[in-house]
């Protein structure tokens, strides 16, 4: 079904970053917003569907049969069936925060491999990369990708307060640079 046909209806499309609010809560040091079993179920679905649909992170929208969701946009700039870099990084960190480090790190590595090694452009801030090729589709100056700097914080299972506190990783990095 095209996106317009879904208005007012439920969709069974699995969104790659359906737990964005969970990531925000973890970064802010807040309690989980959803029951742990719901979070684990959603992460399992994202790994089984969205991660399996590409070698370059997570496809943004995947049907229960594993097909990339076609939102009906012409050309390649259909965000639903490709990889949204910033959103994928947040999803990777959500896996990290919820005890699935191997999966979270693999998602982040897939994205970084596409950006830094495949396209040799690690500092370009791409928005959307192609799910089949890992090559850029859209966005050369997209700042949500700066979320990558929060990856060490998520890998350490820390919130922003503890990560930036005296003696924390940021403090240690600054001290080492001095």
Locate each region found by the language model:
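Active-site core of glycosidic bond-cleaving carbohydrate-active enzymes
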Residues: 2-176
């Amino acid at each position: 079904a095209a996106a317009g046909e879904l208005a007012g209806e439920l969709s069974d499309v699995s969104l790659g970053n359906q737990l964005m609010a969970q990531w925000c809560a973890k970064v802010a040091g807040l309690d989980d917003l959803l029951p742990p079993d719901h979070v684990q179920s959603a992460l399992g679905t994202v790994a089984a569907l969205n991660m399996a649909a590409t070698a370059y992170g997570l496809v943004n929208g995947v049907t229960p049969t594993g097909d990339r969701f076609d939102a009906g946009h012409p050309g390649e700039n259909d965000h639903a069936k490709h990889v949204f870099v910033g959103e994928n990084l947040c999803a990777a960190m959500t896996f990290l925060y919820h005890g699935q480090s191997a999966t979270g790190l693999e998602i982040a590595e897939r994205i970084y491999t596409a950006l830094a090694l495949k396209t040799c452009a690690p500092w370009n801030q791409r928005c959307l990369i192609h799910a089949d090729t890992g090559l850029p589709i859209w966005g050369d100056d997209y700042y949500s990708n700066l979320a990558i700097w929060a990856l060490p914080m998520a890998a350490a299972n820390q919130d922003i307060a503890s990560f930036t506190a005296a003696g924390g990783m940021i403090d240690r990095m600054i001290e080492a640079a001095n």
